[in-house]
Amino acid sequence: MSSSNENAKAQAPEKSDFTRRCSLLSRYLKEKGSFGNIDLGLYRKPDSSLALPGKFDPPGKQNAMHKAGHSKGEPSTSSGGKVKDVADLSESQPGSSQLTIFFGGKVLVYNEFPVDKAKEIMEVAKQAKPVTEINIQTPINDENNNNKSSMVLPDLNEPTDNNHLTKEQQQQQEQNQIVERIARRASLHRFFAKRKDRAVARAPYQVNQNAGHHRYPPKPEIVTGQPLEAGQSSQRPPDNAIGQTMAHIKSDGDKDDIMKIEEGQSSKDLDLRL
C-alpha cells in the first residue's frame, strides 16, 4: 500500500500546464461570471448605422450592465423590450426635419424645422389667394416684334412699274434676262444630249439611223429549164412560174402530135401515087 501511495504522489505533479490553466479559467468564470476586461477578439464591432445601445457591446460590458441593473432593483428586459422603449421615446419627442420653400423665384431651405410649424405654414398658404400670372416680356422680344411690324412684304401678283427705273437698270435687267435664256437653252441641249447617249447605251441592239432609206438588193430572176448554178438559192418558184412551165410542156407535146399526123398523111399520099 505504501508503494502505491508513493506512485500516486509521484504522478500528481506530472499534470500539463494546459489542464491547470483550464481549471483556473473555469474557477474564474464561476466566481466572476465573465472575462472582465479581457478582450479575446470574439465580439463584433458595433455598426455605425445602428446606434442602438447594448446591441453590439462586448460580452463583458453587457454582463456588467446586466448586474448593475439587478443591483439597483430595475426589472430585467430583453433586447426587444429595449428597442421598443427607444422607439417610444423617439415618438414622444417632437420631430424635426428639413423644410424647402419655393417663393418668389427663390428656393429656401431650413434644417431641423419642427413639424407643427410646417403644418401651420401649409394652412396659411392654403388660405392665401392664388397669385395671378404676370406676363413679362423681355426687351429682345419687343425689338423682334417691332422689326416684324416694320417689314412690308411686296405683293408678287401686282405688276411692277418700269417707269420708275432708270435706263441703266432697264438695260441691266434685259441683259440678265438674255443671259438666263442662253443658260437655260444650253442646259436643255446638254440634257437632251445626255439622254440620247443613255438611250443608245441601254438599247439591246444598234439603232440604224438610215432605216427608212434602206434599199434591199433585187431578187434574182428565175429561168425555167436551166440548172441552178453554184451560189444561187434553191427556193421554190412562185405558182405563176409553175403554170407557165406546164403550158410550155403541153405546147411542145401538141407540136409532136401534129408532126406525126403530117408524116402519116404524106406516107398515104405516096402509096396512092405508086
From Swiss-Prot:
Record GO biological process: defense response; response to jasmonic acid
Keywords: Acetylation, Coiled coil, Jasmonic acid signaling pathway, Nucleus, Plant defense, Transcription, Transcription regulation, Ubl conjugation
Range of residues in the leader sequence: none
The UniProt record lists the keyword Zinc: no
Broad class of where this protein is predominantly found: nucleus
Posttranslational modification: (Microbial infection) Acetylated by Pseudomonas syringae HopZ1a.
Pfam families tied to this protein: Jas_motif, tify
Bias-annotated ranges (Basic and acidic residues): 249-274
Region (Disordered): 49-95, 139-176, 206-274
Annotated GO CC locations: nucleus
Induction, per UniProt: (Microbial infection) Triggered to degradation by the pathogenic Pseudomonas syringae HopZ1a protein in a COI1-dependent manner, thereby activating host jasmonate signaling. Up-regulated by jasmonate, wounding and herbivory.
Motif (Nuclear localization signal): 183-190
Its job: Repressor of jasmonate responses.
Record remark on domains: The jas domain (182-206) is required for interaction with COI1 and Pseudomonas syringae HopZ1a.
Family note: Belongs to the TIFY/JAZ family.
SUBUNIT field: Homo- and heterodimer. Interacts with MYC2, MYC3, MYC4, AFPH2/NINJA, TIFY10A/JAZ1, TIFY10B/JAZ2, TIFY11B/JAZ6, TIFY5A/JAZ8 and TIFY3B/JAZ12. (Microbial infection) Interacts with the pathogenic Pseudomonas syringae HopZ1a protein.
Protein name: Protein TIFY 11A
